[in-house]
Regions:
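Small/polar/charged residue-enriched interaction surfaces, especially the RNA/DNA-contacting tracks
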Residues: 1-332
Length: 332
């Protein structure tokens, strides 16, 4: 079933810098600043952007902390092995992938994965979420100065003064610059939608920083879900289902993957989902045929209620999370 398309969610996220931002290139420069922002060719020119991989990494790292704050040892440390997770043993469980067999079927991998691996993926499983690169709007460079030069110095740990020959310089993206990214969920459970909304809410509250120098005041951003675009892009959160399925999702309900699987006769234990994976909406949101999909758009009050209900589902899911069966055969 995970190789079929059951349900989808997509949204456009505007990310505005509330201070200087530096997502470094990761390689040394022969000329110019010691630290420079990553660049790409877009809008017909070289310009700064935020890689989708950087955003996805920040999102995952943040939600791992949130999950394990609600209930310790629910989210795994994806970089640890089962035998070397000593430092995080009290809070994180070992990496999910470290215990999977090479030929393990997808449904078993999904069922045995922790919440963050189910959404973001692992070396054994691709995950449910896609985060695109965040780009500047067209003609952004013509409207304002986007890059500023800064100087920095290293501090001598003994004297507290300036370290000799330790001056460095950096180029940062200026405050008030807006980047836009698209986020796409497919075959999601309701609590996974809530997990995404928790991340977006914390970005709206300016609690998540991006890039380098976060402890030195860099990387503060604020995010918001884009409303209706001037073009064909639908605003708010767009949820859709595939019209080919014989099951019909009522206009006053939102079905997650578990409910769709149950309606197709799949055993709950196969994927570790629940047949009760659905929301009863406070008001009907109509399905509108669009190609092979039935589309629903959540905006304004309907979006606020969707956030509230799905976040509540996320919290309950984590509080009730039980460990997956122990897997003893290591990946070959």
């Amino acid at each position: 079933m995970l190789k079929a398309l059951v349900n989808e969610a997509r949204l456009r996220l505007d990310i505005t810098t509330k201070g200087p931002l530096l997502v470094k290139t990761g390689y040394a420069t022969v000329i110019g600043a010691d630290m420079a922002p990553v660049m790409t060719y877009h809008n017909g020119q070289q310009e700064v952007y935020i890689p989708g991989s950087s955003l996805k990494g920040v999102f995952r790292s943040h939600i791992e902390k949130v999950v394990n704050s609600i209930k310790p040892r629910v989210a795994c440390n994806p970089l640890s092995e089962r035998e070397d997770a000593r430092d995080d043993r009290h809070l994180y469980r070992p990496s999910c992938s470290s215990g999977f067999k090479k030929d393990m079927p997808t449904q078993a991998v999904y069922a045995a994965s922790c919440p963050t691996c189910r959404l973001f993926g692992s070396t054994s499983y691709i995950g449910r979420i896609v985060v695109e690169d965040a780009y500047l709007p067209a003609k952004a460079y013509e409207e304002k100065k986007l890059i500023e030069h800064r100087d920095g110095i290293a501090i001598d740990r003994l004297t507290g003064g300036t370290g000799g020959g330790a001056k460095f310089d950096l180029e940062v993206v200026t405050e008030g610059t807006t980047f836009t990214t698209d986020i796409h969920l497919r075959n999601f459970e309701i609590w996974q939608l809530g997990m995404l909304f928790v991340i977006i809410q914390d970005m709206q509250d300016e609690l998540i920083r991006i890039g380098s120098g976060r402890s030195r005041g860099l990387g503060k951003v604020k995010a918001s879900i884009r409303g209706q675009d001037e073009g064909s892009q639908q605003g708010g959160v767009v949820l859709s289902t595939t019209r080919a399925y014989k099951s019909k999702e009522p206009d006053k309900e939102l079905w997650g993957l578990g409910r769709w699987l149950a309606d197709e006769g799949e055993d709950e234990k196969t994927y570790g989902t629940r047949r009760t994976d659905l929301l009863t909406l406070p008001q009907e949101v109509a399905h509108v045929p669009s190609g092979i999909r039935n589309v629903r758009v959540f905006n304004g009050e309907t979006l606020d209620k969707l956030k509230e209900q799905s976040i509540e589902s996320f919290v309950i899911q984590i509080e009730q999370w039980t460990d997956a069966p122990q897997i003893t055969t290591q990946r070959r």
